[in-house]
């Protein structure tokens, strides 16, 4: 019997791994049918905990990406990127302290929402004006723990970086990109066993507190072999929240658009790669640079990594500030119509693990293809304390916080994806140009109209059972009634789909859990 039980456990683990790809670090450990991550950029830990309980849990979100949580440089104008200049590995940031972090993780896990921490392992802060730094002669943030116990020999020096000022010049040269400094930030020598252990200790502390995994910032600038050695030291996830022997979920920032040099696939045995082709290619389609009909085989045939190795997005904290990509391609909340369409497609299309951006407001100032205000940090008071997020009666947030994850058109598409599950794309239709529709088996259906100056008015096969469905783009199913439009599916699975040429939200989405009768 014991041998049989062990065999069953082994088969279960093998099946779980096959669903989430070949890497032991590719499983996000969502609960139930949940399937979507949102990035709550630089929210306070207490606000995140409350959001899990009042919105993210009930609306079916699977997890949250946090901004970096460890002690960091404090720069004069409090830019958002100071969190990406760590000075040590104590949980202490603008978002809160360790006790607040611990409480947040517990409260979110309790309602089925996983936590993924943005981890900066490539570097420590540079010797810039400000305070919060360590061996490079600046004080500690909050004057805690006498630095991270790192010394100059724990960083790459001229013996391994040969550029004139030790900064990266050629980002496609693996040795230079991984041994030299990223924008002047002190590059950690992860071939050092001491550095590896320090970083593993920090990750293990987060794991023991109940996080499900992490985003690996700037993975492109770290040797895969060094990361593999560090990950080999990691604990399994906390069994108070996860099944025994669960490995942490890790997804890697590897900016790659094709060609030679450092590839996304170099990192997929260590988790998922953030697929930059995805945002760029869908942005070009939504902007009508390429025909919408071409997305019929969107994913790996477009040069992307396999679906089980991908995390996908249409916006991010870097993209919306044009730190990669460019003005006229990248889509963000300043162009809400385009963002909603791109996000709807991402959530309807069965490729990768999707992540939804949730932003705060800042005043863009575009000059010469750059945002001159791209440094502006989160909403804060005169002392630099981050302002709380306050939900409004209409489910939006106070004006300082954009809260795209609370937009009806987005959270209802999160539900769409959860309902569609592993169903394949079916009932594809297009007009040969900028109108498409497709189903997800017998569970869900979406139609999108980006045709210039032309509505979509057509009877289409949906694959859904006969009945009347709430259109989740224009409203919700509440109290047995639709607050928006409806779509009627006949006995043959067909429905009259109507999307006006001037529609603010040029798509219709229905699924079996929004069926009236």
UniProtKB/Swiss-Prot annotation:
Keywords: Allergen, Calcium, Carbohydrate metabolism, Chloride, Disulfide bond, Glycosidase, Hydrolase, Metal-binding, Secreted, Signal. The active site is at residues 217, 253. Monomer. Chloride binds at residues 215, 355. This is Alpha-amylase. Binds 1 Ca(2+) ion per subunit. Binds 1 Cl(-) ion per subunit. It catalyses: Endohydrolysis of (1->4)-alpha-D-glucosidic linkages in polysaccharides containing three or more (1->4)-alpha-linked D-glucose units. Disulfide bonds join 52-108, 397-403, 470-482. GO terms for biological process: carbohydrate metabolic process. Ca(2+) binds at residues 122, 178, 187, 221. It comes from Acarus siro (Flour mite). SUPFAM superfamilies: (Trans)glycosidases (SSF51445), Glycosyl hydrolase domain (SSF51011). Its main location: secreted. GO terms for molecular function: alpha-amylase activity; calcium ion binding; chloride ion binding. The record marks 318 as: Transition state stabilizer. Its EC number is 3.2.1.1. Gene3D superfamilies: Glycosidases, Golgi alpha-mannosidase II. Optimum pH is 6.5. Active in slightly acidic to neutral pH range.
